[in-house]
């Protein structure tokens, strides 16, 4: 952030206690005060400078740009007034009021009149004294009341430096946040790709069926087949063969002497003779019930009623 951008951001801020304290300390550094034992100073003591500045801000409703431009005039006046000069108790109040009036009239198209500024002092200064203060300051400045951007940056550097540091910290934090966010996105993408590859590998059978798994399955199948063969007895085999001979045209020649499976002969299948097969005639439709009607006329009891 440049100094000009920091200055623009500073001008948008509201008036704070730090600003008032800075203006009061700058005004106090211009001239020294020599205490007097006059009856006027004892009867009507001047308010503290910070309280006086706060009162002017409240009555005039001055904003930060105009208020802080007063520091440029205060800095110029500090370089003009000799260091061996002493003022009275209200000298600092007069200096600040004169610089504020010049800043308000220079930077604004419409500003309070001097009679209004005299009222804002709550009786500390009268209108004639306010007019005198303004003319004396114009003579000190040789009627040159221009305020440049460089002057503002120089005088307000204590306020601009924290703004620049804060902006730098925010930019670095945003950069770190962006890097962390991009790193998290990469991690998420990597995790999703890994999970996708795992799911796709799980769907493929060869990757899941290893050699050990296949051998285990084959051994289990062979054990089950041997166990079932042991349970099955010879009479059951003969019964099953007899049943198959009755209901199927195939006949198996099983030699009981051959107990081993390897020496058993291969069963022979007799060819089926299709010439001896009788054709099957399928009837279409349903059998109709034949209703026998009795055509003979039966005598009924009604004939008795018609006889004469």
Swiss-Prot record:
<dbReference type="GO" id="GO:0032878">
    <property type="term" value="P:regulation of establishment or maintenance of cell polarity"/>
</dbReference>
<dbReference type="InterPro" id="IPR013922">
    <property type="entry name" value="Cyclin_PHO80-like"/>
</dbReference>
<dbReference type="InterPro" id="IPR012104">
    <property type="entry name" value="PHO85_cyclin_1/2/9"/>
</dbReference>
<dbReference type="GO" id="GO:0019901">
    <property type="term" value="F:protein kinase binding"/>
</dbReference>
<keyword id="KW-0132">Cell division</keyword>
<protein>
    <recommendedName>
        <fullName>PHO85 cyclin-2</fullName>
    </recommendedName>
</protein>
<keyword id="KW-0131">Cell cycle</keyword>
<comment type="function">
    <text>G1/S-specific cyclin partner of the cyclin-dependent kinase (CDK) PHO85. Essential for the control of the cell cycle at the G1/S (start) transition. Together with cyclin PCL1, positively controls degradation of sphingoid long chain base kinase LCB4. The PCL2-PHO85 cyclin-CDK holoenzyme phosphorylates LCB4, which is required for its ubiquitination and degradation. PCL2-PHO85 also phosphorylates RVS167, linking cyclin-CDK activity with organization of the actin cytoskeleton.</text>
</comment>
<dbReference type="GO" id="GO:0005934">
    <property type="term" value="C:cellular bud tip"/>
</dbReference>
<dbReference type="GO" id="GO:0051301">
    <property type="term" value="P:cell division"/>
</dbReference>
<dbReference type="GO" id="GO:0005737">
    <property type="term" value="C:cytoplasm"/>
</dbReference>
<dbReference type="GO" id="GO:0016538">
    <property type="term" value="F:cyclin-dependent protein serine/threonine kinase regulator activity"/>
</dbReference>
<dbReference type="Pfam" id="PF00134">
    <property type="entry name" value="Cyclin_N"/>
</dbReference>
<feature type="domain" description="Cyclin N-terminal">
    <location>
        <begin position="18"/>
        <end position="146"/>
    </location>
</feature>
<keyword id="KW-0539">Nucleus</keyword>
<feature type="region of interest" description="Disordered">
    <location>
        <begin position="248"/>
        <end position="270"/>
    </location>
</feature>
<dbReference type="InterPro" id="IPR036915">
    <property type="entry name" value="Cyclin-like_sf"/>
</dbReference>
<dbReference type="GO" id="GO:0051726">
    <property type="term" value="P:regulation of cell cycle"/>
</dbReference>
<dbReference type="GO" id="GO:0000131">
    <property type="term" value="C:incipient cellular bud site"/>
</dbReference>
<dbReference type="GO" id="GO:0051302">
    <property type="term" value="P:regulation of cell division"/>
</dbReference>
<dbReference type="GO" id="GO:0031106">
    <property type="term" value="P:septin ring organization"/>
</dbReference>
<dbReference type="GO" id="GO:0030952">
    <property type="term" value="P:establishment or maintenance of cytoskeleton polarity"/>
</dbReference>
<dbReference type="GO" id="GO:0044843">
    <property type="term" value="P:cell cycle G1/S phase transition"/>
</dbReference>
<keyword id="KW-0963">Cytoplasm</keyword>
<dbReference type="GO" id="GO:0001676">
    <property type="term" value="P:long-chain fatty acid metabolic process"/>
</dbReference>
<feature type="compositionally biased region" description="Basic and acidic residues">
    <location>
        <begin position="255"/>
        <end position="264"/>
    </location>
</feature>
<dbReference type="GO" id="GO:0000307">
    <property type="term" value="C:cyclin-dependent protein kinase holoenzyme complex"/>
</dbReference>
<dbReference type="InterPro" id="IPR013763">
    <property type="entry name" value="Cyclin-like_dom"/>
</dbReference>
<keyword id="KW-0195">Cyclin</keyword>
<dbReference type="GO" id="GO:0005634">
    <property type="term" value="C:nucleus"/>
</dbReference>
<dbReference type="InterPro" id="IPR006671">
    <property type="entry name" value="Cyclin_N"/>
</dbReference>
<comment type="subunit">
    <text>Forms a cyclin-CDK complex with PHO85. Interacts with RVS167.</text>
</comment>
<dbReference type="GO" id="GO:0005935">
    <property type="term" value="C:cellular bud neck"/>
</dbReference>
<comment type="similarity">
    <text>Belongs to the cyclin family. PCL1,2 subfamily.</text>
</comment>
